[in-house]
């Protein structure tokens, strides 16, 4: 995380050793604990920031299950955040407070509540990092084994949060390959609601490690009280909400302990990933804006820098890489105003040339039959064509048909005494990042490229296989259950080494599409590939859901060819452009197959996107109409921090004769300002009625503007796709 680079201000505040309300505050919210020496630390409150009088009168809930970090053993029916087997075999643990302190870290403060077991030498620190400039609190736990022998951790949540029962709804994301980020809203009912991941390498294809709780009924986008929670972890996770016979829902989040019990050696400390918590009184979109601001400033690499408009080669040529073709694609994207060209899979392999997906991963040497002038030749072409150059790698993986596997079969994850289950191409395996030698190798893949070719500006880092074979050839027989955790500890070490040496390179996080859209992974990356499905219609749904937790600057959204290569739908070029312009704009197409008219439309759109790019990538998101509400359209908008500029998106989702769509009311504007309207990416023969006119923010938010359902174009160009992008500037 970026906080690792913030100088620690050496100020520690010790709190009194008596009953004490410990207040963890941001600018707009508070998390309150009751910490009394010799007693369990307890939750009092999480919500909007309390004034001193309300804080003084806050009472401790009498329910003993309000412990801030409940441990298993003495209240066995209760759900536990921590469970362990002590070195003598005892399964019971009790935790009482021993003190509290606060340290300032740049733009944040870290409150530590110290707990210990009165019988065993086990210490647990509850950590809370509160930011001064964004409403986000990160909660995590550190467990120290002071016993004489090894302690086995069987449950080790990052945090637990009690939520008062009522009409509480949960919003979360699910999906699969090519259909990531699907949004669901569900009322919490008695019982357990569990979201978990067991993939091993990628953790956001099927479910996401982030949720929102709407406290006033089914969530509204721009009104209502909402708790947002995101587990900042790249590996297997478990989010669990327990609703029993008490007055509370109990939300637990942390590493998925399934097949991952951890043997904590004497003197060793185990640190859980952080759970990022936010609170919004402005609905679901308000919680999203908090995540976006926090992510841009404290998690993403280069979260304050505009992203380049790029052309990626994958859907244009797939494995058919060659020097002349790459040069032509660079020239084409430059001619349309693009700034970066990325060469995808298929450029490497000598003994086993990468002409398909069944070989050569791990053999990161240029195939000179395809690229006789090598990477340097491509960089020369990029300079000639005045674009930056990027390259695809998949460094965590190998194929059985590779020189790497032939040399180091002991480097792969493989169950002993069993034939391996193979992945993509029938030959793919995952390298064991718990092994320091493998960590060195993976770091070396990037290091060798960037040392030899320092002008490489962008890396697309892919990961196309789960950990299918549980077995580490590096870890001891007794520590095989550490594999899932040790893999991601090793991964983090590699990314930290890369970022320490190569601070400026842009790195995209790709994993069979959107398999790594999570804040734990993004701590060293600039952006992620939302999905391998580039169909504009389905991207509206996926990007709407994904925007609940991730900002536009991190969401790679590309214009692709039709029929779409995944769902075979044919949409208009304008529609594809208008969807892609709502994220980090790029192209996933073979330009030589485009007509001059299509290139001209893209050239115009890219030029206009450059004008609105700061608003889209750094502005506040307001979701207006959900595609999931079956109203026949979807709409969002971005508003600059000063509320002097905004970009409004409107996409029609269904086409029926005599259809009646709602007029969309805008949000986030200054009601007292006048905004001049300009349509972007225009294809119509006549302007919109609102074109060039000015409206008050109050009018736009209370009444909105009518959008024509069809485009006014010549008969031969009519189709069933309609979309609008409006640029608003305050006068």
Predicted regions and their residues:
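Polysaccharide-binding surfaces and accessory modules of carbohydrate-active proteins
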Residues: 20-33, 39-242, 258, 674-690
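Conserved, mostly hydrophobic/aromatic
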Residues: 28, 141, 267, 382, ...
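Short Pro-Gly-centered flexible turn/kink motifs
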Residues: 28, 93-94, 262-281, 721-729
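Carbohydrate-binding surface patches
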Residues: 28, 211-213, 221, 627-671
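Glycine-rich, aromatic-flanked loop segments that form ligand/cofactor-binding clefts
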Residues: 73-95, 223-235, 279-300, 338-345, ...
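Aromatic-lined carbohydrate-binding/catalytic grooves of carbohydrate-active enzymes
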Residues: 302-444, 453, 457-458
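Active-site neighborhood of glycoside hydrolase catalytic domains
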Residues: 372-374, 406-408, 412-574, 584, ...
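C-terminal beta-sandwich/jelly-roll accessory domains of carbohydrate-active enzymes
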Residues: 654-731
């Amino acid at each position: 995380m970026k906080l690792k680079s913030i100088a620690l201000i050496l100020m520690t505040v010790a709190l009194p050793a008596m009953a004490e309300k410990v207040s963890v505050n941001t600018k707009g919210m508070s998390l309150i604990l009751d910490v009394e020496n010799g007693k369990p630390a307890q939750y009092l409150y999480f919500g909007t920031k309390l004034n001193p009088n309300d804080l003084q009168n806050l009472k401790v809930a009498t329910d003993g299950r309000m412990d801030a970090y409940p441990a298993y053993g003495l209240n066995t029916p209760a759900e536990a955040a921590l469970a362990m087997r002590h070195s003598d075999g005892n399964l019971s643990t009790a935790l009482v407070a021993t003190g509290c302190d606060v340290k300032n870290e740049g733009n944040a403060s870290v409150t530590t509540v110290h707990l210990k077991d009165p019988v065993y030498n086990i210490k647990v620190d509850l950590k809370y990092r509160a930011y001064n400039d964004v409403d986000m609190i990160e909660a995590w736990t550190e467990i120290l084994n002071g016993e004489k022998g090894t302690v086995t951790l069987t449950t080790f949540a990052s945090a637990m949060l009690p939520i008062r029962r009522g009409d509480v709804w949960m919003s979360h994301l699910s999906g699969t390959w090519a259909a990531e980020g699907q949004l669901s809203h569900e009322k919490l009912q008695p019982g357990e609601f569990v979201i978990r991941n067991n993939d091993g390498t990628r953790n956001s294809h099927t479910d996401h490690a982030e949720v929102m709780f709407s406290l006033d009924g089914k969530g509204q986008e721009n009104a209502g009280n909402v708790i947002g929670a995101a587990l900042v972890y790249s590996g297997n996770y478990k989010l669990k909400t327990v609703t029993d016979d008490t007055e509370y829902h109990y939300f637990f989040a942390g590493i998925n302990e399934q097949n991952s019990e951890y043997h904590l050696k004497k003197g060793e400390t185990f640190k859980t990933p952080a759970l990022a918590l936010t609170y919004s009184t402005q609905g679901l979109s308000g919680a999203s804006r908090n995540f976006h601001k926090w992510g841009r400033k404290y998690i993403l690499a280069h979260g304050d820098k505009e992203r380049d408009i790029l052309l990626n080669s994958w859907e244009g040529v797939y494995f058919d890489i060659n020097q002349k073709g790459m040069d032509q694609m660079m020239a084409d994207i430059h001619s349309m105003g693009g700034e970066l060209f990325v060469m995808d899979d298929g450029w490497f392999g000598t003994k086993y040339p990468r002409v398909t997906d069944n070989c050569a991963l791990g053999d990161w040497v240029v195939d000179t039959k395809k690229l006789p002038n090598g990477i340097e030749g491509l960089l020369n072409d990029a300079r000639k064509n005045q674009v930056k150059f990027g390259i695809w790698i998949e460094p965590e993986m190998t194929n059985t048909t590779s020189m790497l596997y032939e040399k180091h079969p002991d480097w792969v994850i493989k169950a002993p005494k069993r034939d391996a289950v193979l992945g993509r191409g029938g030959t793919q395996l995952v390298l064991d990042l718990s092994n320091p030698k493998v960590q060195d190798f993976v770091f070396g893949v990037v290091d060798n490229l960037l040392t030899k070719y320092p002008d490489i500006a962008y890396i697309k880092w892919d990961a196309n296989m789960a950990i299918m074979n549980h077995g580490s050839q590096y870890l001891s027989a007794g520590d095989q259950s550490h594999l899932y955790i040790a893999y991601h500890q090793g991964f983090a070490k590699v990314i930290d080494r890369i970022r320490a040496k190569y601070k400026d390179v842009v790195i995209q996080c790709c994993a069979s599409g959107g398999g790594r859209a999570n804040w734990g992974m993004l701590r060293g990356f600039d952006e992620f590939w939302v999905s391998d499905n580039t169909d504009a219609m389905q991207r509206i749904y996926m990007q709407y859901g994904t925007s609940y937790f991730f900002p536009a600057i991190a969401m790679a959204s590309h214009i692709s060819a039709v029929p779409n290569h995944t769902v075979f739908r044919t949409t208009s070029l304008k529609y594809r452009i208008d969807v892609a312009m709502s994220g980090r704009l790029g192209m996933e197409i073979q330009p030589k197959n485009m007509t001059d008219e299509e290139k001209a439309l893209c050239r115009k759109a890219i030029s206009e996107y450059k004008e609105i790019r700061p608003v889209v990538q750094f502005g506040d998101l307001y979701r207006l109409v959900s595609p999931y509400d079956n109203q026949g359209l979807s709409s969002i908008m971005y508003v600059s921090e000063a509320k002097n500029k905004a970009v409004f998106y409107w996409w029609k989702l269904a086409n029926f004769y005599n259809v009646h769509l709602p007029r969309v009311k805008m949000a986030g504007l200054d009601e007292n300002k006048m905004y001049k309207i300009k349509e972007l990416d225009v294809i119509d023969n006549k302007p919109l009625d609102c074109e060039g006119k000015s409206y008050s923010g109050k009018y736009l938010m209370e009444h909105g503007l009518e959008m024509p359902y069809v485009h006014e174009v010549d008969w031969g160009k009519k189709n069933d796709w309609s979309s609008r992008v409006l640029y608003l500037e305050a006068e």
